[in-house]
Structure formats: C-alpha cells, structure tokens
C-alpha cells in the first residue's frame, strides 16, 4: 500500500501535520522531490521539531524513512538537521533513515550561483521582480542534473578504488562551468572537497538503492506514506512558471522520484489551507492587500519555516484547487487552519476567473493572463466561534460545516480531515465513503 500526501496550493498548507497524524499507521515514510528549500514544524509532547529535508516520519520510533532519488541533498545540511533533531531527543534516527544512491548532491557553489542567478533574473525583468528562490541551491542542482553534469550520492560513497579521483575531477569541472557562466566568484574548492571526503564514511551507512528498497517494501506489503514537498502550484510544469521550484511536486514527481509505477498508488491526500498563501513573487489572483489579508497573516502567523519570509495572504481559490485536483487525482482532502477564519463575519471564496468579461475554462498557463484576471467570489457566512477546542467534526458550527461542504461540492472530492489548531491533537476526522 502506497498513500501520498501532496500540497494543493503554493506550499505551507500543513502537510507535515497530516503526515504526523498518519505516520503511526505506516512502516515507511518517503520523500520524493525537493531539498531543504521547504519546511514544516511538528509538535510532539510539547517539543517543536523543524523539518526541511528529512522525512517527518522520524518522529515515529517504529518508522523507516527514505529520501528518494528525486530529492537533492546538501550533505552538511542533512547532518545539521539530523543533529538538531537528535539534540531535541529524537532517538535512533540514524538507524531508520536512508538516502537513495541516485539522489543528486547540492554543493556550496550551487547555493552561491542560486543567488547570482536570482540577481541576474531580477535585473533583466521589466518589473525587477525575483523568482523568489530560497537560495538553497536547489534550482542550480536540478539544472546540472538535467544537463547530465551533476554528481550523485553514489559518486561520493563508492568504494571503487578510482571513485574519489573521479569525484574530484567531476566536481572541479562542474565548478569551472559555473564560474565560466557567472564569472569568477569566491569559493574555497579545496575546503569543500576536504569536507566531502570526510563525509564519505559518515554518509555511507545511510545509502541504499532506493528502487530495491521501495519494491522490496511493496512486495512485502509494507504500508508506505509518501510525503510531498512544496505543492502543485510550485511544480516546474504545472505551477505558475517561472515562479516555481525546479522539481515535479505533483503525483508525477512521486513516481519518478521514488521509481514506482502508478498502479502501486492507492490514496492521494490533498492538503488545502482554508485560505490561500504564497511566499515570493508571482501572480496571486485572490490575494488581499487590505485588512482581510493583514488579519489572515496575523492570526495565521504566516511566516515561512525555511526563510522566515512573510507570506502573502488571500481568500481560498477554488480554481486553483480544482486544477490541482485534476492533475493529482486527490481521493480526499485535508482542510487546514480552519480556525484562522473563526472571527470573520463573512468569508469569500474564489470560484472562477474571467478576462475582459469572458470566463476562463480553467487555471491559465499564461501569467500575462493570470495577472489580469477578475475573480468571481461567493460570500459565505462566518461562524464567529472558537473552534480550537472542538474534538469531533459533528460538533463544528453549522456555518463551518457549510464552508467545508461548499469546497467538497465544488471540487468533487470529500473532506476527510479538518485542522482546527496548531497541535497534533487539533485535527478532526470525518468518515468518507
């Protein structure tokens, strides 16, 4: 059994909390895409654990965790995050954490060129806007992967006698091409190579052939949960390109990022914030640059875990959710942070776009169109009631249930979970047929 948790908007929907809720039922939690450019916080026993690259299944002592071949890995950050989790009392993590030998490596010069590329792009754009990169080197690493010049984990940990010499040669060649592209920039290649040589032995016990790992687990009928990173609207193909990440963040990326066939997938859970947020630049049709947006930002504490950047806020966009559902094939939804809407007298929901008076059929791929659309809203009554102490779905205020029903009816997918607060206990479950 392979079930998948995916973000349906622009990230920060609260995927980690659903994974944390479900993880006790699973034998394996796997990451299939991205790197340490995304983040979420899980609270267990009053302790906050921040996850960026590592699977959040580590909070379950009985769960194995895999970083798949579709993920890109900055090794110093990998060990830094692991050590921070261990310092907070997370035990036996090293024996339950595995890395695909086919995953690509992020180097410090990738991070440097990430920032140089951002400056270059913002200088060339007419409006001076940035893509909004986190500066973690993710994009440049996927770029070298696509150009077939990147280095993978197996290149680093190989025990073949000529392996290190070949690694060093490829590293220098890769650095040289980056410096030719962006001009000479300060980088201590000898220090980084020496550091990675030390990492070889420390990293080796974590490394597995992830294809063998996954297919053995499937044949043994292990229960596997795939933890998506980012969200569909940041997908390299289906997101608001170019204001996207550099990987496939939808269901397609799960298959290629773990090496499993579509027939292995059972359930696909779409995580949806009860309103909409995004970090960085790019069109955002339902954004509210007004009191409502400020209120959502303040009550929702909308700051990024990875970057600390303030998130832009707006009303729930059902055009986005329907588009995301079409591509990902969600079988049920988790609506998060419903409690943030508790004090709103009225709540707006975007249900369609139009341009020059003509209604659009679906979410447009052209950002020149997207930036000009008019949004049609439906106004629903609020519930003006604190729902954070409610423990059963049936006890939600009628207007809150009506809000959720409106979402279900619009996208044609049942809501199975509802988040009503930050704690792991603040998640209501609704039976779905």
From Swiss-Prot:
PANTHER family: ADENYLOSUCCINATE SYNTHETASE. Keywords: Cytoplasm, GTP-binding, Ligase, Magnesium, Metal-binding, Nucleotide-binding, Purine biosynthesis. It comes from Eremothecium gossypii (strain ATCC 10895 / CBS 109.51 / FGSC 9923 / NRRL Y-1056). SUPFAM superfamilies: P-loop containing nucleoside triphosphate hydrolases. GO terms for biological process: 'de novo' AMP biosynthetic process; IMP metabolic process. IMP binds at residues 12-15, 37-40, 134, 148, 230, 245, 309. The lineage of its organism: Eukaryota, Fungi, Dikarya, Ascomycota, Saccharomycotina. Plays an important role in the de novo pathway and in the salvage pathway of purine nucleotide biosynthesis. Catalyzes the first committed step in the biosynthesis of AMP from IMP. It is found in: Cytoplasm. Its EC number is 6.3.4.4. It comes from the Eukaryota. It catalyses: IMP + L-aspartate + GTP = N(6)-(1,2-dicarboxyethyl)-AMP + GDP + phosphate + 2 H(+). GO terms for molecular function: adenylosuccinate synthase activity; DNA replication origin binding; GTP binding; magnesium ion binding. PROSITE patterns: ADENYLOSUCCIN_SYN_1, ADENYLOSUCCIN_SYN_2. This is Adenylosuccinate synthetase. The active site is at 12 (proton acceptor), 40 (proton donor). Mg(2+) binds at residues 12, 39. Belongs to the adenylosuccinate synthetase family. Pathway: Purine metabolism; AMP biosynthesis via de novo pathway; AMP from IMP: step 1/2. One of its GO terms (cellular component) is cytoplasm. It is an enzyme of class 6 (ligase). Binds 1 Mg(2+) ion per subunit. Transmembrane segments: none annotated. Substrate binds at residues 305-311. Homodimer. GTP binds at residues 11-17, 39-41, 311, 337-339, 419-421. Its cofactor is Mg(2+).
